[in-house]
Regions:
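Cytosolic-side transmembrane-helix boundaries in multi-pass membrane proteins
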Residues: 1-31, 44, 238, 245-252, ...
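Membrane-interfacial amphipathic/re-entrant helices at transmembrane-helix boundaries
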Residues: 2-3, 10-80
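Short loop segments and helix-boundary regions at transmembrane helix junctions
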Residues: 17-25, 89-97, 121-188, 226, ...
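Single transmembrane alpha-helix segments in multi-pass membrane proteins
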Residues: 42-46, 56-116, 134, 138-153, ...
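Short, non-helical or kinked segments that cap or interrupt transmembrane helices
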Residues: 47-52, 89-106, 149-158, 232, ...
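Transmembrane helix-bundle core of multi-pass membrane transporters
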Residues: 65, 155-226, 279, 333, ...
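Helix-loop-helix "hairpin" substructures at the membrane interface of multi-pass membrane proteins
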Residues: 202-279, 303-304
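Transmembrane alpha-helical segments in multi-pass inner-membrane proteins
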Residues: 259-265, 271-339
């Protein structure tokens, strides 16, 4: 007798849009499960009470005034990169080159500090740094955008490859500008004169990045939701054919949007070199160009929601680092914990978008 195909036990069905409080509840549950698993793993590994683990997570982010400021500064940097990527992502231009665009902006800022530091007044040097960083980041975004607009090249590959070029450029100039010679690093730039160092706000070196992040968040929200350019980005993202039909010049939108995206990444490079580290290295972006992709995607390209996503990721990352330090574990262990947390955060998005529909009753097998 011919066998009848059995129905699957469940189907994956796309949900209607969930209310915000249900989405928030699913994310909260995912974080809770991630924390429980991190606590269990750490307890098994070290024999330490899980409550001490959770206490370390909080103390890692907010254990002192300095740690609190550093946490918010890191949130601001991650948020700025995510905001820079969002216009391109909303247009379905997959810009994976934020890391390189940040490095390009940082390298341009460092070049101004080193080459102009003893030739021009401080205010003029800072102005040159701002222009150079924005221009360098914009150029780094323009190149893959131009090839995409003209020849429809794969933007994921081209933006990714631009990261390697930027990294090697920074590595090259690190040797050219190294101090002292043979050290393999530039060191603190203009440490004696502070020329090119971005000004502090109310005497705090942390506030500038935070203020810039607040301003750019508001700007990006208005730009994407209430401007003609933001509307064009949305239409191109939905359908290029529709955009062309209604008279939108798709190539122009692609290039303009990537110029903006790259320039904002260049601004982050300026803040890192001129305001935070006062030097440039190949690792100055700290991989946040890739983490920002997750922040933007998790937030459904909503600039306001990105504030909370950035806070969550930085809070967990700083907490994981504190665990590895307090309990005598190496930094790789904190990376493991951060990976577990990010895995749960990403996984919960599946349950926000889809649901499992189980079969009501099993089919009787025919003999």
């Amino acid at each position: 007798m011919k066998e009848k195909n059995k129905e699957p036990l469940f189907h994956i069905v796309k949900r209607d849009a969930l209310p915000w409080y249900k989405s928030l509840g699913i994310r909260f549950l995912a974080i809770l499960l991630a924390l429980i698993l991190c606590g269990i793993i750490t307890t098994i590994t070290t024999g330490i009470n899980p409550l001490q683990v959770y206490q370390s997570i909080v103390l890692g982010a907010f254990g002192s005034v300095r740690k609190t400021w550093v946490t918010f500064q890191n949130i601001a940097i991650l948020l700025l990169i995510a905001l820079a990527l969002t216009p391109a992502f909303k247009m379905k231009f997959w810009n994976i080159g934020a890391e390189g665009q940040v490095l390009a902006g940082g390298l341009a800022a460092a070049a101004c500090m080193i080459c102009l530091g003893d030739k021009l007044p401080n205010a003029v040097v800072i102005l040159c740094m701002i222009v150079a960083s924005l221009a360098a980041g914009a150029i780094w975004g323009f190149i893959p955008a131009f090839f995409k607009a003209k020849w429809n090249t794969n933007e994921t590959l081209s933006t990714l490859m631009m990261n390697y070029i930027a990294t090697q450029l920074v590595a090259f100039y690190t040797i050219v500008w190294e101090v002292p010679k043979g050290s393999g690093k530039i060191g603190i730039i203009n440490q004696n004169t502070n020329v090119g160092w971005l000004p502090q706000i109310f005497g705090s070196k942390y506030l500038l990045s935070i203020v810039v992040a607040v301003v750019i968040t508001i700007f990006m929200y208005v730009y994407l939701n209430y401007s003609k350019q933001g509307y064009e980005i949305s239409v191109v993202g939905e359908s290029e054919n529709t955009a062309k039909y209604v008279g939108i010049k798709v190539e122009k939108v692609i290039i303009r949007t990537m110029l903006l995206s790259g320039a904002l990444c260049g601004l982050v490079g300026l803040l890192l070199v001129g305001g935070i580290n006062h030097t440039v290295t190949t690792t100055i972006a700290g991989g946040q160009g890739f983490t920002a992709v997750l922040v933007s995607w998790m937030s459904k390209f909503n600039p306001l929601t990105m504030v909370f996503s950035s806070f969550l990721i930085i809070f967990m990352d700083r907490g994981a680092s504190e665990i590895s330090t307090n309990f005598g574990l190496n930094h790789s262990y904190s990376d493991i914990l951060t990976g577990i947390i990010l895995f749960f955060i990403i996984g919960c998005e599946f349950f926000i978008t889809y649901r499992l529909q189980f079969r009501k009753k099993a089919e009787k097998e025919e003999q």
